[in-house]
């Protein structure tokens, strides 16, 4: 067997690519056609239009393949009726290993395989299903018929919206290319726009779900929907935990931009919890009611004092990270989805 490695590169000068490919050919066997613009990468379709100044990413093919495996013909035909991936009014129950409601025949439904495919899609081009997929995956080891229906609903939703994807733009891109899929706080430039939120004690374990999303050039570039490792005892603590996660990721991305020669100022962190903002902006001091999470709070205070992060209050109605903390009602979900994704079929 021959080892196969994939390498994706971004270069401004074509002569740099020629030089690099020449050096690689001296050491490795490279197939004909390599070194060309990327059209497909790990199931993602990438379309770049240099003249009009945008790049789109979607996973229509991967979603269609998954739907054909998970859904029957009737479920695929009725997929267009599914407007959002998970019902906010029907939480999924945890099933014990000896529960009679468990699906014991794993061949009846391959939940782990389905969750793996959904995680890849949710983490690559579909941030709108990140919260629903995260909730589903918590039940992958012990699931019942209700969980199977929830998995199929997510796949149906993805299949019905398989043409939606991310669109990134440069400064002079045509307005119609990004009139949707962009939050009002995102001006479409090389500037990181960060949102952080938390749903306090939402799980049966009373742990809080943390959500964050970072946008740049008109679309999300990083997002997270994860259950906290410990139980937060207040809304402020849960929000501080989410803010720390968002700030760490944002500072890492800022350092990458600086290596690319893009000068970036402080990270603007949008938060809708006044207590979290007050604790973070309070300077390097010990908050009496925050002793049990003082380490995370002190780190957050430090990056704010240093000028690396600036808190900005964001009303809950505009808090994009709310999408990543819990299933939302249809109207709110669709509003936030339009601020992240675009129908890319007319761009291809």
PLM feature spans:
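Long, low-complexity, charge-biased intrinsically disordered regions
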Residues: 1-348
């Amino acid at each position: 067997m021959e080892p196969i490695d994939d390498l994706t590169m971004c270069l401004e000068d074509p002569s740099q690519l020629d030089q690099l490919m020449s050096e690689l050919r001296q050491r490795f066997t490279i197939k004909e056609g390599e070194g060309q613009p990327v059209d497909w990468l790990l199931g993602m379709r990438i379309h770049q239009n240099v003249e009009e100044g945008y790049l789109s990413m979607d996973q229509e093919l991967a979603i269609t393949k998954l739907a054909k495996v998970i859904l029957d013909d009737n479920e695929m035909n009725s997929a267009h009726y599914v407007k959002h991936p998970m019902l906010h009014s029907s939480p999924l129950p945890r099933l014990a290993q000896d529960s009679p409601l468990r699906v014991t025949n794993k061949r009846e439904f391959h939940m782990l395989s389905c969750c793996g495919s959904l995680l890849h899609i949710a983490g690559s081009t579909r941030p709108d299903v990140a919260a629903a997929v995260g909730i589903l995956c918590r039940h992958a080891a012990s699931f019942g018929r209700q969980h199977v229906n929830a998995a199929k609903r997510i796949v149906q939703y993805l299949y019905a919206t398989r043409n939606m994807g991310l669109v990134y733009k440069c400064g002079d891109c045509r307005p119609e290319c990004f009139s949707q899929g962009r939050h009002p706080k995102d001006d479409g430039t090389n500037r990181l726009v960060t949102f952080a939120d938390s749903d306090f004690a939402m799980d049966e374990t009373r742990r809080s779900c943390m959500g964050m999303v970072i946008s740049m050039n008109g679309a999300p570039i990083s997002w997270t929907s994860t259950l906290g490792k410990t139980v937060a005892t207040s809304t402020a603590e849960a929000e501080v935990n989410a803010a720390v996660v968002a700030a760490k990721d944002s500072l890492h991305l800022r350092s990458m931009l600086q290596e690319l020669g893009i000068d970036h100022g402080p990270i603007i962190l949008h938060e809708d919890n006044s207590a979290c903002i007050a604790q973070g902006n309070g300077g390097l001091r010990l908050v009496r009611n925050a002793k049990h999470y003082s380490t995370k709070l002190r780190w957050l205070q430090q990056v704010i004092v240093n000028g690396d992060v600036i808190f900005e209050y964001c009303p809950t109605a505009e808090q994009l990270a709310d999408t990543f903390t819990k299933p939302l009602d249809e109207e709110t979900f669709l509003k936030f989805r339009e601020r992240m994704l675009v129908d890319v079929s007319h761009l291809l």
